[in-house]
Amino acid sequence: MSNSRENSVYLAKLAEQAERYEEMVENMKKVACSNDKLSVEERNLLSVAYKNIIGARRASWRIISSIEQKEESRGNTRQAALIKEYRKKIEDELSDICHDVLSVLEKHLIPAATTGESKVFYYKMKGDYYRYLAEFTVGEVCKEAADSSLEAYKAASDIAVAELPPTDPMRLGLALNFSVFYYEILDSPESACHLAKQVFDEAISELDSLSEESYKDSTLIMQLLRDNLTLWTSDAEYNQSAKEEAPAAAAASENEHPEPKESTTDTVKA
């Protein structure tokens, strides 16, 4: 490792400790754009850096969008107009971050990937950031982002099924986020539940073969898969019940459910 690369990695770790994630991104982007393969540690640092800056803005967008809906429902048009302008500012930041990550992935990281594990990691990341774009965009832009996300998740899944065991944390994390994509973006609870259950059942059947170092990561993601299955199943039952009783209650219930859980770390033991 060259001194400049070593320094960038060290500064990224320092920025993470200081919770200065924009600077963490800046340093890891230098490493990622070097056209050399990233180590497991380096790609995890890159993922964590971007996940933190995108995560904060996704949370902000959800909060602001919720307030906007409430103001509109109260007929407060002046406040709603101000909020809309503020929401657009957050969306511009989200868009810039997503396109920045996707550019690094498509120009540098995916072409340089040689192992099945690294390809799954980067295609999953590509699927994630196109999914984040699809969360707040509309019309043709949203459709294109959703199509690109689906394509990336499918590419990652094909490689994962061929090259990684069912209990592998990366394969499980991919399935977790792919199922969230089906539920949230494609509005397909059936596909989401089918994928989550299939992957969970396959992993359960091979749990005994898990190495000690992967056990904690794998079982944590399996728990998240099960939590989402429980959430989505109860949502479906509640919505069906609400629709049978009162259409207005059904409409309200569809907007009042907890966020499904995603894979928040991409750490894989070397």
From Swiss-Prot:
InterPro entries xrefs? 14-3-3 (IPR000308), 14-3-3_CS (IPR023409), 14-3-3_dom_sf (IPR036815), 14-3-3_domain (IPR023410)
Give the keywords, sorted.
Cell cycle, Cytoplasm, DNA damage, Phosphoprotein
Instruction: Extract the ranges annotated as region (Disordered).
Output: 240-270
Biological process annotations from GO: mitotic G2 DNA damage checkpoint signaling; pericentric heterochromatin formation; protein localization; signal transduction; subtelomeric heterochromatin formation
Q: Which cysteines are joined by disulfide bonds?
A: none
- Please give the residue positions where the record annotates the modification Phosphoserine: 234, 253
The record's GO molecular-function terms, alphabetically, read: protein sequestering activity
Under the heading CDD domains, the entry gives:
14-3-3_fungi (cd11309)
Chain intervals with Basic and acidic residues compositional bias: 254-270
User: Per the record's keyword annotation, is Nucleotide-binding included, yes or no?
Assistant: no
Q: Which GO terms describe its cellular component?
A: cell division site; cell tip; chromosome, telomeric region; cytoplasm; cytosol; nucleus
Of which family is this protein a member?
Belongs to the 14-3-3 family.
Tell me how this protein assembles: Interacts with rad24. Interacts with byr2.
Q: What is this protein called?
A: Checkpoint signal transducer rad25
What organism is the protein native to?
Schizosaccharomyces pombe (strain 972 / ATCC 24843) (Fission yeast)
Gene that this sequence comes from:
rad25
